């Protein structure tokens, strides 16, 4: 497999998940990205490993296929359906656990503080009430921060990490049991601590962890939990279950099983088929109805009523029976919705821009410092948020008249929604029959505040709504990214709902549009702002429709989200894509830009290969594995034929051979071409060295300077054949000699063969080599042994390993002339990790990895392409 070396790849100074990486600790940030032209700065990047989504069809796998019949196939499929159902049920139970304790802690906190405020408002001891609120919030946030110290990947919503995992990037620790425990417990405390975060977004990450861990029936964190379960021992199977778990998390959070399925398709999975669609939808349904069953029973005491489908419920949107002029929305309102979509996109782009700058500041000034600094930052955010909420509720609120009518439906669910709206009204410092509008929004759980904006018949002051929006916008932006488990869906919905309600108030009070329904504008405002932040369209439309249970909102929500996305995309990316980029994850988008088709596979591949032979000595394998970090190696043989004799005496044959040679791309030729292009596009290292020698070297020596530098940088390939002797004077053709490609073998497979003693003596036939079954090869999944932990004294370096039974003899390959768009589509849709480039005569000339298809790498190659035209 190919690595990327800074001296050879002038367009790219960093190494990626599948290429050669520099030695560093996982916590260390290294400057790996290029200078960003729009910001003129270098972003820190990390090395990431890719996942093996491509199936390795080797001899052990074929042996399993030989024993497979229709009966076993049906049993395997039945087990998969049962596992999918279990994932949905467990995800629903996780949501139930989170919701129960968040409600418990929040009610306890607000109950104590509200009682204190009511008593101290007359005694003049409001400072004591503020201290009580600070005590609750700081304690909860401190506990949430401690849990993130235990498992740092539990911070945030986890959606960017899950998106990367489904895209094929292995994010360390993302789907571990310890991560799930820290995530679930941490989100309890962060939400109860009054931070402007939510519990619904982290449900996606929690569901993904359940989906990844449950089918394995074992845990790294709890090593005693070990079951001999023979199924689903590959990244390919785990990816499908993670997709189902992520969809189940969305379904449990919003009561939207179809929206969850579309979310998994739109935002995550790069590979999809009809069978997976049914399983993901079934998993989402299982999660929704599990949560619905238990929540309805616990809150209403009516088991089996299924009245609370998700953690977040918007209630029923319905005009008052006494208002005959009211309509949920009209055709004329669509114009206002489009304008709101534009404003929502602008606000979302502003939010993302500010949060990106904050994230960069944290990466440079907070994360490199001791971990205690992260805890202190979280406590500072909690302190400021608590003071702002308390002071704004006490000082900036206005007393508004309570509505004389209530929207009470015929069903118990709508009655519950109405009771929640009425019971969450806060009357701080207001006379009878009035309420404090600012305190009603700030001194309630976010879900209750959203219901107030959606369904409260009473009015909110435009000044209050504007102040609430500004304060909430800034604090939510500051909060997202601190070291606590958090989410952004509900804060964005609440912020957008305030914006929409403000628009409705302005239209009613100053333009005289009395027919409009304020709840509709609050919903559209919520959709506009959320769409401007996350840039989701299809899945978010369905999620909001399912949450409102009102299909007539389909058109305005879809139009608003599309306009918000188009507006926001003009300025920057969505919030999750921004954080993926800041982490340096080599995420592959859905497709490449049209301009990239000017490049071909030969332009982006890595010709400097590290390879193995079909029969290789143990000493050579150990040397290769210990001196490189590549995750796959081409299995090759050398071409030693001499075609010069055939070219004598027959002009026809001579011309045919010359044509064949001219049409076949070789690694030496490609390397020489790149060496020439580097003279016109030198790296700083080459430029400095050239400057040092420019005065003393003769013209002939100048031309060979780059060649000499490149040859000195690379040591000859390890000697694997006894009749070859290493030479420091190898030419480019000798170093990049033709190699016939036979297949790919993974690092994990080679290490497994060495650990299990799969080899044979030189005096024996390769048939005497022990054979491993498919189950034995996958026994150590997902954490295979490391070559550096291998006891070399137990190995005979002269023994030979026959890798041919265990290599993949038929991986996907491309021609050197394949356009980049074709390479990209094949790589992404098939979930590949390595893509060999093979010429017309079966010789491998390079290899393409995820790194070679990232936007930064392709842009750099395109610039180099323009330089050489």
Swiss-Prot record:
Modified residues (Phosphoserine): 773
Effect ascribed to mutating residue 410 to A: Abolishes N-glycosylation
The record's account of how the chain is modified after translation: N-glycosylated on several asparagine residues.
Site (Mediates proton transfer from the outer aqueous phase to the interior of the protein): 200
One record GO biological process: response to mechanical stimulus
PROSITE patterns reported in the protein's UniProt record: CBS (PS51371)
Molecular function terms from GO: antiporter activity; ATP binding; chloride transmembrane transporter activity; voltage-gated chloride channel activity
Tissue/organ expression: Testis, ovary, small intestine, brain and skeletal muscle. Low level expression in aortic and coronary vascular smooth muscle cells, and aortic endothelial cells. Isoform 3 is only detected in kidney.
Outcome following mutation: residue 422 to A: Abolishes N-glycosylation
Annotated glycosylation sites: 410, 422, 432
Span of the annotated motif Selectivity filter part_2: 198-202
Catalytic activity, as annotated: 2 chloride(in) + H(+)(out) = 2 chloride(out) + H(+)(in)
Functional note: Voltage-gated channel mediating the exchange of chloride ions against protons. Functions as antiporter and contributes to the acidification of the late endosome lumen. The CLC channel family contains both chloride channels and proton-coupled anion transporters that exchange chloride or another anion for protons. The presence of conserved gating glutamate residues is typical for family members that function as antiporters.
PANTHER family: CHLORIDE CHANNEL PROTEIN CLC FAMILY MEMBER (PTHR11689), H(+)_CL(-) EXCHANGE TRANSPORTER 6 (PTHR11689:SF158)
Protein name as catalogued: H(+)/Cl(-) exchange transporter 6
Organism: Homo sapiens
């Amino acid at each position: 497999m190919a690595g990327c070396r800074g001296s050879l790849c002038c367009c790219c100074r960093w190494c990626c998940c599948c290429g050669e990486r520099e030695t560093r600790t996982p916590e260390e940030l290294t400057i790996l990205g290029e200078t960003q032209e729009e910001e003129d700065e270098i972003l820190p990047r990390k090395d990431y490993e890719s996942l093996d989504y491509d199936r390795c069809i080797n001899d052990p796998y074929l042996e399993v296929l030989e024993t497979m019949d229709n009966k076993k196939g049906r049993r395997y499929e039945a087990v998969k359906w049962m596992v999918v159902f279990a994932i949905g049920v467990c995800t629903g139970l996780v949501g139930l656990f989170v919701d129960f304790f968040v409600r418990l802690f929040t009610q306890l906190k607000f109950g104590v503080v509200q009682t204190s405020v009511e008593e101290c408002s007359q005694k003049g001891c409001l400072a004591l009430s503020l201290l009580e609120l600070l005590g609750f919030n700081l304690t909860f946030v401190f506990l949430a921060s401690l849990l993130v110290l235990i498992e740092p990947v539990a911070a945030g919503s986890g959606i960017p990490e899950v998106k990367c995992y489904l895209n094929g990037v292995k994010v360390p620790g993302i789907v571990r049991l310890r991560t799930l425990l820290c995530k679930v417990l941490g989100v309890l405390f962060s939400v109860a601590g009054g931070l402007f975060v939510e519990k619904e977004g982290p449900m996606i990450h929690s569901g993904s962890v359940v989906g990844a861990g449950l089918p394995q029936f074992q845990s790294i964190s709890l090593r005693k939990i070990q079951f001999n379960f023979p199924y689903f021992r590959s990244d390919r199977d785990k990816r499908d279950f993670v997709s189902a778990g992520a969809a189940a998390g969305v379904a449990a959070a919003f009561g939207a099983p179809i929206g969850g399925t579309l979310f998994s398709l739109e935002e995550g999975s790069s590979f999809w088929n009809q069978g997976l669609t049914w399983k993901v939808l079934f998993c989402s349904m299982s999660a929704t109805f599990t949560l619905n069953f238990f929540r309805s029973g616990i809150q209403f005491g009516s088991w089996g009523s299924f009245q609370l489908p998700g953690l977040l419920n918007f209630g029923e949107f319905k005009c008052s029976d006494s208002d005959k002029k009211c309509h949920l929305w009209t055709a004329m309102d669509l114009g206002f919705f489009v304008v709101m979509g534009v404003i929502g996109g602008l606000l979302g782009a502003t939010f993302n821009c500010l949060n990106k700058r904050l994230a960069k500041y944290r990466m440079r000034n907070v994360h490199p410092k001791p971990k205690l600094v992260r805890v202190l930052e979280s406590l500072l955010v909690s302190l400021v948020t608590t003071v702002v909420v308390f002071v704004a509720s006490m000082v900036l609120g206005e007393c508004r008249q309570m509505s004389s009518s209530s929207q009470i439906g015929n069903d118990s669910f709508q009655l519950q929604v109405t009771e929640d709206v009425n019971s969450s009204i806060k009357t701080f410092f207001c006379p009878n029959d009035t309420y404090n509008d600012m305190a009603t929004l700030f001194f309630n759980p976010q879900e209750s505040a959203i219901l107030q904006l959606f369904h409260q018949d009473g009015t909110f002051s435009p000044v209050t709504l504007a102040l609430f929006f500004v304060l909430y916008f800034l604090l939510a932006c500051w909060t997202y990214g601190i070291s606590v488990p958090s989410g952004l869906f509900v804060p964005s919905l609440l912020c957008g709902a305030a914006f929409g309600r403000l628009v409705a108030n302005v239209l009613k009070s100053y333009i005289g549009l009395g027919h409009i329904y304020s709840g509709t504008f609050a919903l559209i405002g919520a959709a506009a702002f959320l769409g401007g932040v996350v840039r989701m369209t299809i899945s978010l439309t369905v999620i909001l429709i399912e949450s409102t249970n009102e299909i007539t909102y389909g058109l305005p929500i879809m139009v608003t989200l599309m306009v918000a996305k188009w507006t926001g995309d003009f300025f920057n990316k969505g919030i999750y894509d921004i954080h993926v980029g800041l982490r340096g994850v080599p995420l592959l988008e859905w497709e490449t830009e049209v301009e990239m088709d000017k490049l071909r596979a030969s332009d982006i591949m890595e010709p400097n290969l590290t390879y193995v032979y079909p029969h290789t000595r143990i000493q050579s394998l150990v040397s290769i594995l210990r001196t490189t970090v590549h995750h796959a190696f081409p299995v090759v043989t050398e071409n030693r034929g001499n075609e010069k004799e055939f070219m004598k005496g027959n002009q026809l044959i001579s011309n045919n051979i010359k044509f064949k040679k001219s049409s076949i791309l070789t690694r030496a030729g490609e390397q020489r071409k790149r060496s020439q292009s580097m003279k016109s596009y030198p790296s700083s290292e080459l430029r400095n060295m050239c400057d040092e020698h420019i005065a003393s070297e003769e013209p002939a020596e100048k031309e060979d300077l780059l060649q000499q530098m490149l040859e000195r940088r690379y040591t000859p390939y390890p000697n694997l054949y006894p009749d070859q002797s290493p030479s420091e004077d190898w030419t480019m053709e000798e170093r990049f000699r033709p190699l016939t490609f036979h297949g790919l073998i993974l690092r994990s497979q080679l290490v497994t063969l060495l650990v299990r003693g799969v080899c044979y003596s030189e005096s024996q036939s390769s048939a005497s080599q022990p054979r491993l079954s498919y189950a034995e090869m996958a026994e150590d999944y997902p954490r295979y042994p490391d070559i550096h932990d291998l006891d070399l004294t137990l190995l005979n370096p002269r023994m030979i390993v026959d890798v041919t039974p265990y290599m993949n003899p038929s991986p996907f390959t491309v021609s050197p002339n394949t356009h980049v768009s074709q390479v990209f589509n094949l790589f992404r849709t098939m979930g590949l990790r390595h893509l060999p480039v093979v010429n017309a005569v079966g010789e491998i000339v390079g290899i393409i990895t995820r790194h070679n298809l990232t936007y930064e790498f392709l842009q750099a190659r395109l610039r180099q392409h323009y330089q050489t035209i």
